[in-house]
Amino acid sequence: MVVGKIIKISGPVVVAEGMKGSQMFEVVKVGNEGLTGEIIQLTEDEAIIQVYEETAGIKPGEGVEGTGAPLSVELGPGMLKAMYDGIQRPLNEIENATDSIYIPRGVSVPSISREIKWDFEPTAAAGDEVITGDVIGTVQETASIVHKIMIPFGVSGKIKEIKAGSFTVEETVAVVETAEGEKEIMMMQKWPVRKPRPSKGKQAPVIPLITGQRVEDTFFGLAKGGASAIPGPFGSGKTVTQHQLAKWSDVDVVVYIGCGERGNEMTEVIEEFPHLDDIKTGNKLMDRTVLIANTSNMPVAAREASVYTGITIAEYFRDQGLGVLLTADSTSRWAEAMREISGRLEEMPGEEGYPAYLSSKLAQFYERAGRVECLGSENKQGFVCIVGAVSPPGGDFSEPVTSNTLRIVKVFWALDANLARRRHFPAINWLTSYSLYIDDIAGWWQQNTAADWRSLRDEAMSLLQKEAELQEIVQLVGPDALPDRERVILEIARMLREDFLQQDAYHEVDSYCSPLKQYNMLKIIMTFYKKGLDAVAKGADPAGISAVTVKGDIARMKYLTDDEFINTKVPEIINKMESELGALIK
């Protein structure tokens, strides 16, 4: 074991000498208190270490001890419902062990409890041939998730022994005869966070991730296995949007990373999630959630670790054939931590002081999203979706973190402070947002809703763009100076904005909108548009079209349940629309 000595301390960065024989990204214990750090640079016998805990009080001359292993996470039963810090230390366990609301420096608590016994049900038998990724048994970890115990990476052979019963994560549940000898299989694995977990290959992203949010699903859809960015200034609704995604997305597991954000936002998640019901399983949402809390008052170096810890945990669940949503709030804070560490290392700064390798670091993270064919002899498919919030100072989307993120992700949900001030939520700007997955996922929508889904969506988008062009004229001369046809377009665009795009996150029904309901709502508004144009062409007054009472029914449709709306209200609204607009024709 390498033992060195501290020669320099600069905030979270420590320089130690006598470290010959150490490896890059090796975890070390720094100082007399044994603070956790990671080697990020090696020159001859000196090592530069980023420390994941507060360095106040340590001094030159204190020891640095290598562990011989990279920064790794423990993967196994017991992660769901847990709350970790950025380096996978369990916060609840630390509180119980230390009887303190603060994290003591140098504290060491296992990430996964060694005391809890889990009921292991074998799905393989002695004599079976197994390879990396094969499922040999299951554990009912929570009411929502059956945890699959897999053969770890690099192990293949014949099962010599496998037993059912209650075991801790460190006890042997199976023995595999390999070419190198017998290997004992535990329920827990370890994996280095900076190394992506392997798979057989990536699949095309052709299935949409249904979030229940109309603007995201219908207009700017994200595919399963895709990556998305949510940039927006302060108060525009980034965190609530991410909470909505965590609550309603069509996934099996949610990994929520609070990376450098305010502590009260994580508190909201911790207080709210245990009381929320999961629409897929009927159980509590927390049963399928892993929380990583790395708030703004925690050491900056741990922000980078928290992002890698979260994606490694997400990949582990993906390898079980599950769908995972990883939300990182916010990647800007992680980039700011990189900027601080880079400054301490006296590296040449890039744009706005960020390091020159900012884009490659962001790409390494987002590239770990994907829909994959999992390792193993079974035909398992899993996916990881990444949704990263970006907090550009002053809402400036041209700043380096936002612009570099845009080069990597294929979905851009741009939050607009002006919309938020007008109380239009979700405040996703339909003119600046985009999705490059629309062509890929259109087939699924047409198969599961109706063949005209794509044409309705494209027509609605063009109406909203046309409205933006007309607004300049309206502000100069007023709407009455416009031709009748364009006055109808303005009215329909307003209905699209207020009755379709606006959604109440705190309303019992409107918080989640199913794909079929989304299609029918859009269909009704676009039918009103076509019939309104016909009526105007036949002599109806646009002011009369704006005054019909069916518009009230259209405005209320978002608050109706699927069953009531699709089966009862849709034909009623269409009939009422036809009779009222027909009566306007002279």
From Swiss-Prot:
One GO cellular component term noted in the UniProt record for this chain: plasma membrane
InterPro entries, alphabetized: ATP-synt_VA_C, ATP-synth_a_Xtn, ATP_synth_asu-like_sf, ATP_synth_asu_arc, ATPase_a/bsu_AS, ATPase_F1/V1/A1_a/bsu_N, ATPase_F1/V1/A1_a/bsu_N_sf, ATPase_F1/V1/A1_a/bsu_nucl-bd
Keyword tags: ATP synthesis, ATP-binding, Cell membrane, Hydrogen ion transport, Ion transport, Membrane, Nucleotide-binding, Translocase, Transport
UniProt: ATP binding residues: G232, P233, F234, G235, S236, G237, K238, T239
Keyword Transport: yes
Membrane topology: Peripheral membrane protein
One Gene Ontology term from the biological process aspect of the record: proton motive force-driven plasma membrane ATP synthesis
Domain of life: Archaea
Subcellular location: Cell membrane
EC number: 7.1.2.2
Principal location listed in the UniProt entry: membrane
EC class: translocase
GO molecular function, one term: proton-transporting ATP synthase activity, rotational mechanism
Any Pfam family matching the protein: ATP-synt_VA_C
Signal sequence coordinates: none
Catalytic activity: ATP + H2O + 4 H(+)(in) = ADP + phosphate + 5 H(+)(out)
Assigned protein family: Belongs to the ATPase alpha/beta chains family.
Subunit relationships: Has multiple subunits with at least A(3), B(3), C, D, E, F, H, I and proteolipid K(x).
Function, in words: Component of the A-type ATP synthase that produces ATP from ADP in the presence of a proton gradient across the membrane. The A chain is the catalytic subunit.
Name listed for the protein in its UniProt record: A-type ATP synthase subunit A
Phylogenetic lineage: Archaea, Methanobacteriati, Methanobacteriota, Methanomada group, Methanococci
Name of encoding gene: atpA
